[in-house]
A protein has these predicted regions:
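RNA-binding accessory domains that recognize and position tRNA/RNA substrates
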Residues: 1-151
């Protein structure tokens, strides 16, 4: 059984305009007991498909849409394609010089809700700001984090 978020009648309008957030007040019910961060199908009250979203039960934004395409699979290849598209845009904007710094992935702007990657020279800083982003973090490369709190 596919896990689902079913919206209240008339609450699909923002999704039809491609807004990626699903607020808790727009949800009629959740079916299938999805885990925090798990990808669910989002449907209108009449059953029409609206998108694939990461589920965040502890947030006011209970769904963050990964894709509005019914045929898209949300897997490692999905994330690779979205990351490659974000990189290609930064290259087009001449933001990829090795000594520079920029925001390589900017969450919803790059169709990766809750994921931010900043680059400062040879260092990358990854922020996972939602349950769906954390749930799918097994797709990220291994890294070493050195944190110094002493100033």
């Amino acid at each position: 059984m596919t896990k689902k978020i079913i919206l209240k009648k008339g609450r699909e309008k923002s999704l039809l305009r491609r807004h990626p957030w699903i607020f808790s007040g727009a949800i009629e019910r959740v079916e299938g007991e999805p885990l925090p961060g798990e990808t669910v199908q989002v449907t209108a009250a009449n059953g029409d498909f609206l998108g694939w979203a990461g589920f965040s039960p502890a947030s006011q934004i209970m769904g963050r849409v990964w894709s509005f395409d019914i045929n898209e699979r949300i897997d490692a290849d999905f994330f690779k394609k979205r990351i490659a598209a974000a990189w290609a845009l930064r290259e087009k904007l001449s933001l990829t010089a090795p000594e520079g710094g920029c925001r390589l992935i900017f969450s919803e702007a790059d169709q990766l809700p809750g994921v931010i990657v900043d680059r400062f020279g040879k260092f990358l800083i990854l922020q996972l700001l939602s349950a769906p982003a954390e749930f799918n973090s097994s797709s990220r490369p291994p890294c070493i984090l050195l944190r110094c709190s002493s100033g």
